[in-house]
Swiss-Prot record:
First-level EC class: isomerase
Organism: Shigella dysenteriae serotype 1 (strain Sd197)
Catalytic activity from the UniProt record: uridine(55) in tRNA = pseudouridine(55) in tRNA
One function term, GO molecular function aspect: RNA binding
EC numbers: 5.4.99.25
Stated name of the protein: tRNA pseudouridine synthase B
Amino-acid positions noted as binding substrate in the UniProt annotation, renumbered to this chain: 43, 76, 179, 200
Length: 314
């Protein structure tokens, strides 16, 4: 007889985890889920195991709104090793080519400039994108290369930090879907020497405050502290969470009176004053502005429900 499935807490919010190096994003997610004893958890765009930095982890009902963070821009600090190209475009891969580093400062500046603004990027074979239902890195591990279409991305800002010997350090502010490993690999080819990532840190995601990032070590320390004080760990852990609607913070807010919100929560579009003419909106209810879901302005100017918060009984 199988054991009944253990249900976690109905905790809703977003934890800004500072992911450690050498850990997969999914492993980090599972550790946070266990620490919080959450019933559901999901991240908002994986970081490579080599990378560190901000990994927003959505808990509970916040997982419904994680898609809006996938569309947000990101900020990275990267250090490239020049003169070596690897099969994964980072230090976790095998060196496949070595070439001398002979470019000038002027050539470097010109090459960097080609990566600023709107560009097309062909994703690495070592990525989680899918081809015919299978992830690209699964093909790559079998030594198979499949066709990939170039995808439009935007590099809002690319700052040169330093070039010392065989190391090049940059800061890159970019749109969703940007592969920093691919930028470095492509840059190495433009410079004629090859390059791969040896250090990568995600500094920011969307408008989340960097100072709210926490490490796994800090979470574990809080759990131990709660045990010593004989209090529930949630009392120390839950205040670290950002609001569940924070992934959609770029969208305008529409507040519904309680007389209208009951219809909205039952799946019906409602009319209200002060709504924008079109697009997605965050919907709140009542004087306290409680978040109840995402809506979209329909052709008749009504706020139609798109994703609703489910309230579980205590």
């Amino acid at each position: 007889m199988s054991r009944p499935r253990r249900r976690g807490r109905d905790i809703n919010g977003v934890l800004l985890l500072d992911k450690p190096q050498g850990m997969s994003s999914n492993d980090a997610l599972q550790k946070v889920k266990r620490i919080y004893n959450a019933n559901r958890a999901g991240h908002t765009g994986a970081l490579d195991p080599l990378a560190t930095g901000m990994l927003p982890i959505c808990l509970g009902e916040a997982t419904k709104f994680s898609q809006y963070l996938l569309d947000s821009d990101k900020l990275y600090r990267v250090i490239a090793r020049l003169g070596q190209r690897t099969d994964t475009s980072d230090a976790d891969g095998q060196i496949v080519e070595e070439r001398p580093v002979t470019f000038s400062a002027e050539q470097l500046a010109a090459a960097l400039d080609t990566f600023r603004g709107d560009i097309e990027q062909i994703p690495s074979m070592y990525s989680a994108l899918k081809y015919q239902g299978k992830k690209l890195y699964e093909y790559a591990r079998q030594g198979i290369e499949v066709p990939r279409e170039a995808r439009p991305i935007t590099v809002y800002e690319l700052l040169f930090i330093r070039h010392e010997g065989n190391e090049l350090e940059l800061e890159i502010h970019c749109s969703k879907g940007t592969y920093i490993r691919t930028i470095i690999d492509d840059l190495g080819e433009k410079l004629g020497c090859g390059a791969h990532v040896i250090y990568l840190r995600r500094l920011a995601v969307s408008k989340y405050p960097v100072e709210r990032m926490v490490t796994l070590e800090h979470l574990r320390e809080l759990v131990e502290q709660a045990e010593q004080q004989d209090i529930p760990a949630a009392e120390l852990l839950d205040p670290l969470l950002m609001p569940m609607d924070s992934p959609a913070s770029d969208y305008p807010v529409v507040n519904l009176p309680l007389t209208s919100s009951v219809y909205f929560k039952n799946g019906n579009p409602v009319r209200t004053s002060g709504a924008p003419l079109e697009g997605l909106v965050r919907v709140t209810e009542g004087e306290n502005g409680k978040f109840i879901g995402m809506g979209e302005i329909d052709d008749e100017g009504r706020v139609a429900p798109r994703r609703l918060v489910v309230e579980y009984p205590a």
